[in-house]
A protein has these predicted regions:
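Short acidic/glycine- and proline-prone juxtamembrane loop motifs at membrane-interface regions
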Residues: 12, 65, 102-115, 155-156
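Membrane-interface transmembrane helices that cradle and orient dolichyl/undecaprenyl
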Residues: 84, 123-140, 150, 169-179, ...
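Transmembrane helical bundles and short interhelical boundary loops of multi-pass, membrane-embedded
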Residues: 166, 172-176, 180-207, 211, ...
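Loop-to-helix entry region of an early transmembrane alpha helix in multi-pass inner-membrane enzymes
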Residues: 40-45, 54-74, 91-94, 106-110, ...
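Short helix- or helix-capping micro-motifs
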Residues: 93-98, 105, 125, 147, ...
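Transmembrane-helix motifs of polytopic, lipid-linked glycan transferases
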Residues: 63-84, 122, 126, 294-299
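Hydrophobic, aromatic-rich transmembrane alpha-helices
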Residues: 271-307
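Transmembrane-helix signature of polytopic, membrane-embedded enzymes
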Residues: 76-99, 131-142, 312
Length: 402
């Protein structure tokens, strides 16, 4: 993912917001006004650290995104290992997540989303490993730590934490009501004896206190230990994300359209020759993301009919972070908000492709097809590749993609 990451050598898309904010953090004394106060500081601090290490240029701006993109792939592997208990399907899920194109593109631009994604996926992996354990305390604490770091990059990192809170609260309520399935099985998503020693104070420590402490700690370098400064920073983030009027955008889209890839985001479109352009379009690989939709329907059927825990977890961590956008008052949306759900969709595909008596080759055949789709999209995924206008137009299959 690092190859050609320094192209273009200028800012593109939202780098114009985040790199100057990261530069400001390197000043001996933080000047006023603070740039980009609408997001928490951690991702910008990581970009600032990279600028200090590699210089104030394209490599310094974008290297941490590449690193966290690679870590996201590792985190998908850990999620797959938790779900399928075998390395083969976990590797397949990681490859499909990479080939979905969104993760690759988002890793090569100095934006905040890839950092929140990586921390969030590590949190989900820890939660899913703990989900099947009698004593999930350590795994759940690690999940809370990771979710605190995700939220410290972007508040959308809280969505996966909210999913975990809802899952644990629902299971505890059902246990309190002494709910039982008449034909209960070990593979059920709910069991009366799940987590016998996990108390309410453990829940509060893992999913409230620990994430909050980790999150607030990232503000200390900017605001010190001033309670008023920390509170004002949170008020500003909330205000800017919920009440500030934001004009429309050429590539904005509504959340119901994201799974269908109706409206991509053109990050870059530069003419570099007589018939050569450098383009970066966040679109998603249709081979992967359209195929994921029937796969999710099969997961839903299996959860309802057979109560499978793996199907339940896939559905929870796909739909939770995705549908959370439907509840927010913010009207300006972009396809890259779908990145966490799109990445997690790879696990739904692996679940379905190895389900029942499916031949082993079927999963790897799909990985190969996904790879072919990714390769075909490379001219619009990486600016250093370049392409002709004819090829670009051919890749824009629908009018809404232009």
């Amino acid at each position: 993912m690092l190859v050609g990451v320094t192209t273009p050598e200028k800012f593109y898309f939202d780098e114009v917001h985040y790199v100057p904010a990261a530069r400001q953090m390197l000043e001996p004394v933080m000047p006023n006004p603070v740039l980009n106060p609408m997001h928490p500081p951690l991702a910008k601090q990581l970009i600032a650290l990279s600028i200090r290490s590699f210089g104030d240029g394209p490599l310094g701006w974008r290297y941490p995104g590449v690193l966290f993109g690679a870590l996201s792939i590792v985190a998908v592997y850990l999620c797959g290992l938790a779900l399928f208990a075998k390395p083969g399907p976990a590797v397949a899920a990681s490859l499909i997540a990479f080939f979905n194109q969104m993760l690759f593109v988002q890793s090569r631009i100095a934006m905040l989303d890839i950092f929140a994604l990586a921390f969030g996926l590590f949190g989900i992996a820890a939660f899913m490993h703990g989900f099947r354990q009698a004593r999930p305390h350590l795994a759940f604490a690690l999940a809370g730590l990771a979710f605190g770091l995700a939220a410290a990059c972007k508040w959308s990192g809280l969505f996966a934490l909210a999913v975990c809170i809802v899952i644990v609260a629902a299971i505890r309520l059902m246990q309190g009501w002494r709910t039982q399935f008449a034909d209960g099985r070990d593979g059920d998503w709910y069991r009366p004896g799940l987590w016998p020693d996990f108390r309410y104070y453990h829940f509060a420590a893992c999913f409230v206190l620990l994430p909050a402490v980790v999150y607030l700690a990232t503000f200390v370098p900017l605001h010190g230990l001033s309670a008023s400064g920390l509170v004002e920073a949170q008020r500003r983030i909330f205000s800017d994300n919920t009440t500030t009027a934001i004009a429309g955008h050429t590539y904005m889209s509504a959340w119901p359209s994201w799974p269908l890839l109706v409206r991509p985001v053109w990050y870059l479109f530069d003419k570099i020759g007589d018939d050569r352009i450098a383009a970066v379009v966040l679109l998603g690989n249709p081979v992967v993301l359209w195929a994921a939709l029937p796969a999710l329907a099969i997961c839903l059927r299996d959860w309802i009919v057979t109560r499978r825990a793996d199907a339940f977890l896939v559905l929870a961590f796909y739909f939770g972070p995705y549908l959370a956008w439907a509840l927010l008052p913010r009207t300006l949306g972009f396809l890259y908000y779908y990145l966490p759900a799109a990445t997690f969709a790879s696990l739904a595909l692996v679940y379905v492709l190895r389900r029942g008596n499916s031949p082993r080759w079927l999963l790897w055949a799909f990985v190969a097809v996904a790879c072919a789709g990714f390769a075909a999209m490379l001219p619009i995924s990486a600016a250093f590749v370049g392409t002709s206008m004819e090829t670009f137009v051919r890749l824009m299959l629908f009018q809404s993609w232009i």
